């Protein structure tokens, strides 16, 4: 998880390459493939012979509307084509099934809820969470990296519970 607009991209790139080099045999990366941090990490994972599974926060056609630049959308599609598996998180049950209304709050569920559900999925099914962000949790946005960090903290606090699985380590 991380910022869409990455500062210090060269440092983030180097730290991610070091992470994958030190991680032992290739494994699986789960990623939303959003522009910025997600795409950077997915590219490095693929270069490191890891499998990448795309976990999309909503149906593909709707998710593609969130890419603000043509180059980012093209990069997303190229990465998606290299993914081992693609999972689309279903729309929250309170969202009108007319996909065009997902951006409008309806019964308390918004587009941000779909990103929050992506964060929950990643925290539940990931053992190590990589966070590429500024570290500011003072004003978490729904579904943003700060909220994902708080979800990770809650999961780590429960890690001694045999019923709890998911994140066991967070790297910032």
Predicted regions and their residues:
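Acidic/glycine-enriched connector segments
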Residues: 1-172
């Amino acid at each position: 998880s991380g910022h869409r607009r990455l500062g210090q991209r060269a440092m983030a790139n180097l730290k991610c390459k070091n992470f994958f080099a030190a991680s032992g045999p290739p494994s699986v990366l789960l990623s939303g493939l959003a522009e910025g941090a997600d795409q950077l990490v997915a590219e490095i994972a693929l270069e490191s012979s890891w499998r990448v599974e795309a976990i999309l926060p909503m149906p593909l056609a709707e998710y593609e509307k969130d890419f603000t630049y043509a180059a980012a959308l093209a990069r997303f599609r190229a990465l998606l084509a290299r993914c081992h598996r693609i999972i689309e998180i279903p729309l929250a049950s309170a969202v009108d099934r007319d996909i065009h209304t997902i951006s409008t709050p309806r019964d308390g569920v918004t587009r941000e809820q779909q990103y929050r559900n992506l964060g929950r999925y990643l925290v539940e099914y990931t053992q190590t969470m990589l966070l590429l962000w500024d570290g500011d949790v003072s004003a978490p946005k729904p579904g943003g990296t700060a909220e994902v960090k708080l979800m990770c903290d809650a999961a780590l606090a429960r890690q001694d519970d045999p019923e709890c699985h998911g994140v066991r380590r967070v790297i910032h």
